[in-house]
Amino acid sequence: TFFGNFISGQWVPSDSGATLENRNPANTGDLVGLFADSTASDAERAIAAAKHAYQSWRLVPAPKRAEVLFRAAQIIEKRKEEFARDMTREMGKVLDETRGDVQEAIDMTYFLAAEGRRQHGQTAPSELRDKFAMSIRQPLGVCSMITPWNFPMAIPSWKIIPALVCGNTVVLKPSELTPLSSVHFVKVLEEAGVPPGVVNLVVGGPAVGELLTTHPDVSVVSFTGSTAVGKLVNQNAAPHFKKVHLEMGGKNAIMIMDDANLELALEGCVWGGFGKIGRAHV
């Protein structure tokens, strides 16, 4: 099965026509799907679509944006088992853990949908006569979201849903290793009623990532991944004064003291090393 990019409400191949294979790591003979192998021109079109959609999406009342996201949470909840099984097939976590990954996306989407009615500003007394001082919350614009393979539905939800409920638009670049989970997530948003161009999906490598972090029409960059790539993202975005969020790789030390419960401590060590295929930073 071929899965294209999602740009301006349409599922389309990459401009180059190239594809990426996604295979089951536990059975490399099992081809999960073929995905668009995108170039900078694909990312350019996605950013343009997001910029255009922003002009109308930002004007949709926040409670109405939230209603769309609430519907998305309901759809994911109904299809949780399907999404979890596909996630296990494409990236290797055991089914119990991929169910948890999908559940995080459900919980985050429900929680952030409620923020549609909590985007409060502030009022303050003014030192000037006949003046009224207040602050309001406003969206920032186009947001680039670059996500890793280890939590392929939870992490996109953490980034995309807050951006959408606040009136921003999004271009998502998932890991090339786990694009199917992101395709599922974006299709859910499409089904829930997110307008064309508000969410865009581009699967690809460094050329896509570079444009998403340097393009002048991108206001926010949110990246989760390795420290080396995170440094590069920051270097790319800094000259343009973009707002940048980085969550980078970490190795958590475990110190076992003399009075520790050894059985409990060893259980923690083993879980930390092998739980969630050893890719949880806890």
Model-derived segments and spans:
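A structured beta-alpha segment of the ubiquitous adenosine-cofactor-binding alpha/beta core
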Residues: F132-A133, N200-S219
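Conserved small-residue-rich beta-alpha loop and adjacent elements
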Residues: Q122-P196
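ALDH superfamily catalytic-core signature
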Residues: A228-H281
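Active-site pre-lysine segment of PLP-dependent enzymes
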Residues: S182-E191, P206-H215, A228-P239, M255-D259
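Terminal low-complexity tails and localization/encapsulation signals of metabolic enzymes
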Residues: T1-F35, E67, R71, G121-I146, ...
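Short beta->alpha connector loops at strand-helix junctions that form conserved
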Residues: N168, K173-S175, V203, T224, ...
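Glycine-rich loop-to-alpha-helix module at the N-terminal edge of alpha/beta enzyme cores
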Residues: R23, T28-Q119, D130
